[in-house]
């Protein structure tokens, strides 16, 4: 009895459309769709476009393999999209480039999908000020007492507090210290 090996060929996946966006003034091409945490194709988000542009956007709650909670707000960015006229066609500047209509408010980059011609601004003074405010509210009940922390200095909260100049909170309330469920000093190995 002989067996013949057969090679099964799978059809190539359809080419995913690429679109042009600008991240901090640098134009890049990114796929319109990317696989989400479950493998399903979903619209590419601003934070994914920034990662492809090698531009770091600080974040705590975003992870590419998990659903997007959008809770931490550290990934706030400013953005603009091509302005459209009454005929739904892009309004052009004198030099022929599309006029960009800047959004009146920031967006969380982990949950906002990109669109063709979008411009993303990750380091404007307004973005930095917003991140400082978000970080300050996160530090209200979190002491930066790193020697006793389990993370032992490998902590994004500590890194971002240094990057954004928040070594202490302006709020004078006492920190919330809850008792541990299990007193670790009683455990003997």
PLM feature segments, named:
Residues 22, 53-59, 127-132, 184:
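Short Cys/His-rich Zn2+-coordinating modules
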């Amino acid at each position: 009895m002989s067996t013949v090996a057969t090679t099964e060929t799978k059809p190539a996946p359809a080419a995913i459309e690429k679109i042009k966006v600008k991240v901090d003034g640098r134009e890049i091409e990114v796929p319109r769709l990317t696989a989400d945490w479950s493998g399903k194709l979903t619209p590419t988000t601003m934070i994914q476009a920034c990662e492809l542009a090698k531009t770091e956007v600080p974040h705590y709650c975003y992870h590419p393999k998990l659903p997007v909670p959008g809770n931490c707000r550290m990934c706030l960015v400013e953005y603009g999209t091509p302005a459209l006229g009454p005929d739904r066609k892009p309004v052009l500047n004198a030099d022929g480039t599309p006029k960009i209509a800047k959004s009146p408010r920031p967006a969380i980059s982990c949950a906002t999908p990109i669109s063709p011609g979008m411009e993303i601004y990750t380091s404007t003074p307004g973005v930095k000020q917003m991140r400082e405010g978000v970080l300050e509210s996160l530090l209200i009940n979190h002491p930066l007492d790193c020697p006793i922390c389990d993370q032992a200095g490998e902590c994004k909260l500590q890194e971002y507090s240094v990057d954004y100049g928040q070594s202490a909170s302006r709020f004078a309330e006492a920190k919330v210290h809850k008792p541990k469920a299990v007193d670790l000093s009683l455990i003997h190995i």
